[in-house]
Amino acid sequence: MSSYQDHKALAELTLGKPTAYCDHYDVTLLQAVPRSMNREPLGLYPDNLPFHGADIWTLYELSWLNSKGLPQVAIGEISLNADSVNLIESKSFKLYLNSFNQTVFTDWESVRTTLQQDLSACAQGEVSITLYRLDEMTHQPIANFSGECLDEQDLYIDSYEFNADYLQGAAGKNRVTESLVSHLLKSNCLITHQPDWGSVQISYSGPQINREALLRYLISFRHHNEFHEQCVERIFNDIMRFCQPETLSVYARYTRRGGLDINPWRSNTDFVPLTGRLARQ
């Protein structure tokens, strides 16, 4: 269980509570969660963050009415800077997007501008937004994380409780530059404990990380309760602490829920994330 499970910032969230669905625009549905809530226990503060990055959201259920009342549909891609004060709680984001359904917007740019203004204000940070017509996405291939997959190791696993100590002594003597991938990342929502399924890519330069230890560490998230963004920052922080690579990038892409997927990345180098959806997305 996360040490901040009962943090006061979580008390007013609609997440985990019965909720009425509104189909007319209502910005008050958006709810923020302070990033400091999980960062401070890790010793991370705005003036000493060891990474930069973003939370990339894909919006699959976005619709509104044009000026003639004709429904419009789009796929949205949103990138929220990791140095924003808050992350955006996903259920509230879903409810907020639902409020567009019977709302008239004069054009697509009005929708994009509204999203940008509202999300920036909620997160207190920089947000970039792209809206795609469906025919722009039709030929987008299923992407795949580049790197060597950890998942075929023949391991006996008997513990699924989070334990960063799996990384103790995991840094070897040889120095390498490599990318490692696992599709076995599974954690649980901090509030509802619903499962969150993801794939993670870890790219680094430095002492070679023991692959068995790294996979055991990632599997130990299986009963861990934390938001997607927080899990990625925890992985980054633990690898830096135990393995001390010179460069590190951690990028996770999670399966969608409620028409949204969340894909956080954190890096201390010039990492550029792919944005194509993976097989399970």
UniProtKB/Swiss-Prot annotation:
What top-level class of enzyme does the UniProt entry assign? oxidoreductase
Q: Which Pfam families match?
A: QueF, QueF_N
Catalytic function, reaction form: 7-aminomethyl-7-carbaguanine + 2 NADP(+) = 7-cyano-7-deazaguanine + 2 NADPH + 3 H(+)
- Identify the residues that bind NADPH: S90, K91, R257, G258
* A GO MF label: preQ1 synthase activity
Q: In which pathway does it act?
A: tRNA modification; tRNA-queuosine biosynthesis
- Enumerate the active-site residues: C189, D196
- Sequence positions that bind substrate: I88, E89, S90, H228, E229
Quick one: where is this thing mainly located? cytoplasm
List locations, semicolon-separated: Cytoplasm
GO CC terms, sorted: cytoplasm
Quaternary arrangement and interactors, per the entry? Homodimer.
Could you tell me what this protein does? Catalyzes the NADPH-dependent reduction of 7-cyano-7-deazaguanine (preQ0) to 7-aminomethyl-7-deazaguanine (preQ1).
* Family under the similarity heading: Belongs to the GTP cyclohydrolase I family. QueF type 2 subfamily.
Protein name as catalogued: NADPH-dependent 7-cyano-7-deazaguanine reductase
In its UniProt entry, the species of origin is given as: Yersinia enterocolitica serotype O:8 / biotype 1B (strain NCTC 13174 / 8081)
Q: Top-down, what is the taxonomic lineage of the species of origin?
A: Bacteria, Pseudomonadati, Pseudomonadota, Gammaproteobacteria, Enterobacterales
